Amino acid sequence: MLLQSQTMGVSHSFTPKGITIPQREKPGHMYQNEDYLQNGLPTETTVLGTVQILCCLLISSLGAILVFAPYPSHFNPAISTTLMSGYPFLGALCFGITGSLSIISGKQSTKPFDLSSLTSNAVSSVTAGAGLFLLADSMVALRTASQHCGSEMDYLSSLPYSEYYYPIYEIKDCLLTSVSLTGVLVVMLIFTVLELLLAAYSSVFWWKQLYSNNPGSSFSSTQSQDHIQQVKKSSSRSWI
């Protein structure tokens, strides 16, 4: 009578004489996870990391524009909230580090790298949420400051020789500055929302990668290899 036992893709046939002959099965469903780790995982993490690094570069560049661009003093309260918080630079640096870790973790999928990616993405989610609040507050303050241009123009236009005290080009410059600053904040807001979504998705992704995707599979694979070696040794002894 022929008895069969299967262990991790290897079957062992026991003949009537007690000789064990290991037989390897054809690759099946058990190798799909390994194929994903080798092909799908690096591609997905590289895309996520690259977009996060792009968000880092754009947000930091726009922050530098806000620092060095000249604008009227009554716009300072609207912009200083975001700049003094350090979000355009520290937050962008956090996004860049997170993206770099995601790319590295995809190419070298080990538990320490996966845990680092999970932690950094969680921190990036909180940072992006705080940045979203700061940018929204700055946009509201900027809208209030922009109304100052129109109200001051109406007041000075009622005075005699108003063109002498407040030339028309200064009014246009005030409005143009308001539009430019609003555009910069809107673009920063868009990429902050994008980073928030990416960081939240990546946090869930790395959480599943760590705890939901066959935990302890590497340990089981090691046990399987040790068992195969023992079976081969017992088989050779039986032949002798």
Swiss-Prot record:
Q: Which domain of life is it from?
A: Eukaryota
Q: Does the keyword Transmembrane apply?
A: yes
Gene Ontology BP terms:
cell surface receptor signaling pathway
The record's keywords, sorted A to Z, are: Membrane, Receptor, Transmembrane, Transmembrane helix
Q: InterPro entries of this UniProt entry?
A: CD20-like (IPR007237), MS4A (IPR030417)
Presence of keyword Cell inner membrane? no
Q: Which residues lie on this side of the membrane: Extracellular?
A: 69-83, 143-178
Q: How does it sit in the membrane?
A: Multi-pass membrane protein
- Which residue windows are transmembrane per the record? 48-68, 84-104, 122-142, 179-199
Q: Which residues lie on this side of the membrane: Cytoplasmic?
A: 1-47, 105-121, 200-240
Q: Identify one Gene Ontology CC term for this UniProt entry.
A: plasma membrane
Expression by tissue: Ubiquitous expression in normal tissues. Expression is more elevated in adult liver, lung, spleen, and heart than in their fetal counterparts, and is higher in normal tissues than in the cancerous tissue or cell lines. Low levels of expression were detected in the promonocytic stage, whereas high levels of expression were detected in mature monocytes.
Segment Disordered: which positions?
Answer: 218-240
Compartments where found: Membrane
User: What is one Pfam family matched by this protein?
Assistant: CD20
PANTHER family the UniProt entry points to: MEMBRANE-SPANNING 4-DOMAINS SUBFAMILY A MEMBER 7, MEMBRANE-SPANNING 4-DOMAINS SUBFAMILY A MS4A -RELATED
What family does the Swiss-Prot or TrEMBL record give for this protein?
Belongs to the MS4A family.
Q: What does this protein do?
A: May be involved in signal transduction as a component of a multimeric receptor complex.
Return the protein name: Membrane-spanning 4-domains subfamily A member 7
